[in-house]
Amino acid sequence: MSQSFYNESSSNQTNFNQQHSLNHGGHEMMDMHEAIGEIIAGMNQAIILRPQVKDQELLSILDRQYNFTLGMYNTIVESFKTGHDPSVPTGRYQMDTGNDFKYGLTPGQPKKPMQNANEINDEAISGFLLGAQKGVAKCMTAAATETTNPVVRRVVADSIPNCIEMAYELSIYQNKHGYYQVPQYSQQDMQTMLNAYDTTSNPLH
């Protein structure tokens, strides 16, 4: 009697786990594969580029972001495979730098594609890392809007701000070193655009 009850309970638990792990729509499966693949590509890129980094500040950013992304990857994959809450919840990435941008353009040499792999430098590496973070953020945003599994949707949606934060940190690094210049409109044009909209208070009843 007790053995039969145990077998039945075990079978029910197995069916429950299978139902959760298979609780995914077709669009979700395709978008999640693309998003996870994008995360892997970014991590692989960091591993390849790391030995070429010269600046210790950039090396610190690369290591910190890679280690955080590793945990994020495991959390996403676990929730995707099981359909359950992951054993390690989504973390929050904390930048280790300020958030001040330098505005304005300084003339410099025109940019052009590299002719030789030996031309790799910190400007190019930080650009590759920034592009990877932007790519992951875009893929996960698309995946979150197509996801039917509630756990996976929440985990992916909660991970997007971390990708944005990591991309922001890299853009600050690039701006600081003159790799990523930020132009501005004139003060008059800025005021015109800032005042182009106003708040409203007309809710539906």
Residue ranges, per PLM feature:
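Residue-identity detector for glutamine
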Residues: 3, 13, 18-19, 45, ...
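Conserved alpha-helical segments that form or flank metal/cofactor-binding pockets of metalloenzymes
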Residues: 6, 56-104, 167-177
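A contiguous, mid-protein "functional segment" used to position or interact
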Residues: 149-185
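Leu/Val/Ala/Ile-rich N-terminal alpha-helices, chiefly Sec-type signal peptides and the beginnings
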Residues: 1-43, 50-53
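Carboxylate-rich helix-loop segments that flank metal/cofactor sites and access channels
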Residues: 9-15, 82-126, 183-203
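Hydrophobic alpha-helical segments
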Residues: 69, 162-163, 192
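Short, surface-exposed linear patches
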Residues: 55, 149-152, 196
